[in-house]
A protein has these predicted regions:
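Conserved acidic, metal-coordinating active-site core of Asp-based
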Residues: 99, 103-222, 231, 238
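Asp-based phosphoryl-transfer active-site loop
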Residues: 7-22
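Asp-based, Mg2+/Mn2+-dependent phosphohydrolase catalytic module
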Residues: 222, 227, 232-270
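Hydrophobic/aromatic beta-strand patches that form the interior of the parallel beta-sheet core
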Residues: 44, 69, 208-210, 227, ...
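Short, well-ordered alpha-helix to beta-strand connector turns
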Residues: 6, 40, 65, 148-149, ...
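Non-catalytic pre-domain segments flanking phosphatase-related domains
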Residues: 1-11, 34, 38, 269-270
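Active-site phosphate-binding/coordination module
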Residues: 24-123
């Protein structure tokens, strides 16, 4: 096949590339990333994490990255340099944060420089969740109207989500079971993926996306090749071109092999 193997390959982090049973990237996934790079592919993360929530990723992983779409599309980085920020409408930010202050909801907001913080309310449960996932805990500083790229408010109460929805006039709301995410209207994982790929000179057909969660669905659907992890949610699997094995059963490596994005070890040597 004379078609170039080079692609822009985008990975969700948690439960797709980074295993929380291992607290690391599986060895086979590291092998896949190294081989993708040898084939001229660009490797990027595509995540809801704010920039500060990336600091404790394994150095071996960050050394392999060409770019990151953070804050669910709110910040796009090429080799550590921010090339685009999608600012949430200030009125929307004010209304949602004010609602959360009045209704005792915990908020984590993230600014244009990648900083993250809780606002007025804070619970040990959510702080522990951040520590479990990201090995860091956000500080707590009241929002003072600085530009934001991402707001997460925590509630399991659908009525509270329904009360917040009409407060957002120009923003995108991703409702998850507990962590509900606000971004600018034009910011999501899919748009961030396509913008970074274009910046690198790849078109949509040359993008590959790996994901597992509800917030990965659009990215998986829009990518030239969309792959859901075996441990992923049903919506991700339905959107995918291919469902691979679980993260802890070499899912990333097996999918790369299946589509010829990389070659098996022993055939590579002649």
């Amino acid at each position: 096949c004379c078609m170039s193997k080079a692609r822009a390959v985008f990975f969700d982090i948690d439960h797709t590339l980074f295993s929380h049973t291992l607290h690391d990237v599986p060895a086979s996934a590291y092998t896949a990333l190294e081989k993708l790079k040898q084939n001229g592919s660009q490797i990027a993360l595509c995540t809801s994490r704010a920039v500060e929530e990336l600091v404790n990723l394994p150095p071996k992983l960050t050394a392999l990255l060409d770019g990151v779409v953070c804050a669910q599309g709110g910040i796009i980085m090429d080799h550590g340099k921010i090339i685009a920020s999608k600012i949430i409408d200030e009125g929307d930010a004010e209304r949602v944060i004010d609602y959360c202050r009045r209704n005792n909801l915990v908020v984590r907001y993230s600014g244009v420089h990648g900083e993250n913080s809780h606002d007025l309310h804070y619970t040990q449960e959510i702080s522990d969740l951040f520590y479990f996932l990201y090995k860091m805990r956000p500080g707590q500083t009241l929002w003072k109207h600085q530009p934001l790229v991402n707001i997460i408010f925590y509630t399991r109460d659908a009525q509270q989500v329904d009360a917040i929805r009409p407060l957002l006039h120009n923003s995108h709301l991703m409702v998850m079971h507990f962590a509900n995410e606000v971004t600018a209207a034009d910011a999501n994982k899919a748009s961030g993926m396509l913008e970074l790929a274009a910046h690198w000179g790849f078109d949509e057909s040359q993008t590959v996306a790996f994901g597992d969660g509800y917030n990965d669905v659009e990215m998986i659907r829009r990518a030239g090749l969309g792959i859901a992890m075996g441990n992923g949610c049903d919506e991700a699997k339905q959107a995918a071109d291919y469902v691979s094995d679980d993260i802890d059963r070499d899912g990333v490596y097996k999918a790369c092999l299946h589509f010829g994005l990389i070659e098996e070890e022993n055939h590579a040597e002649n």
